[in-house]
Amino acid sequence: KKLSQQLVKAYDELNITKTLNIQPVAGFIKGETAAGTGLSTKTADYVRDIQKVNTSQLVKLFDKSQPDGNINIFGKSIAQVLGDGGSNRKGTTKVFASEALNEKDIYTYAQSLAGSIPLVEVRNAKGVVYYAKYDGKIINLRNYSTSAQESKARWTIDIIGNKDINKVSNLSDNKFEIKFR
């Protein structure tokens, strides 16, 4: 019942402000799936719609024919960083000047890419990784990067196995990254 109320509230907020805020919903997804219960059909459909919108936007980032390299996260337009410390020339890594986003925003965005599959936390010697595997794809969110000094990245999302990105980027790489400063 609480999840339904949060969904209605998020939908109402979207209609009024034209800004989608799924942060409360992400918390319920994690809670419901941890409790061993599945999501209701309505909730699963809602989450799948958010996933489609955000994944479509993500795929466009790697499309070399798209002139706009910005990304919209929770109503905030985040500019891509080009040049030194920015996105790489090959096109597999995009860096964003995302200082306006907090850790929860970035985590929730990564969760939206994974849909109803909750991100699982793993700690290692380098830091923390949250990951989700679905439909032959993997979404990793990590708080470390080997290029952190150059890119100034706080968080990196790895997108592994997304054939749509391969198609639009004309690259055969299996792993693409978006980095958040």
Regions found by a protein language model. Name each.
Residues 117-180:
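Functional cores of ribonucleases/endoribonucleases
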Residues 1-117, 121-122, 160-164, 172-181:
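Low-complexity, glycine/serine/proline-rich disordered segments
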